[in-house]
Amino acid sequence: VGDIVATLAPAGLCFGRIANFINGELWGKASQVSWAVIFSDSGAGVQPRHPSQLYEAGLEGLVVFLYIQHRFWQNRVAQEHPGQLAGEFFIAYSIARIICEQFREPDDVLIAGISKGQFYSLGLVAFGVILIMLARIHTARTSAGKSKD
C-alpha cells in the first residue's frame, strides 16, 4: 500500500505548494532576483521574495513524481521489493525539502541551526533507509523460502 501511495503523494505535494503560492503562504526569503514576487496581504511585507512554494512544487512535487513514476513503471521496484518505493519516496522528498528550505523564510525556532523542516527531513531520510532495508530483507527471506520448496 505504501508503494502505491508513494506514486501519488508527490502530485498532492505539488498541488498543495501551488495552493500555498496562490494563498501567499509559506513565502520565501527576501530576494532581488528578477522572478521574485511580492505577496500582498500575506504578512510578508512588500519586499520581493523567492517564490519558494513554486520551487517546492517543482522539486518536491514534479521531480519526485517523475522519479517515483520511473522507478514504479520502468524498474518495477515495487513488484520486486514491496516497500522499497515508499522508502525511496521518503528519501527523495526529504532531500528535495532540505534543498528548498534554503529559499524559504526560516522558522522562528531553529533546531541545531537548521529549520524544523530540514530537521524533520533528516528523520524521514532515516525512516526511508529503514523501509528500504526491511523491504530487501523481506524479499531475501521470501526468495529463500521459495527456493527451498
Model-derived segments and their meaning:
Residues V1-D149:
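A feature for loop-to-transmembrane-helix boundaries and adjacent hydrophobic helices
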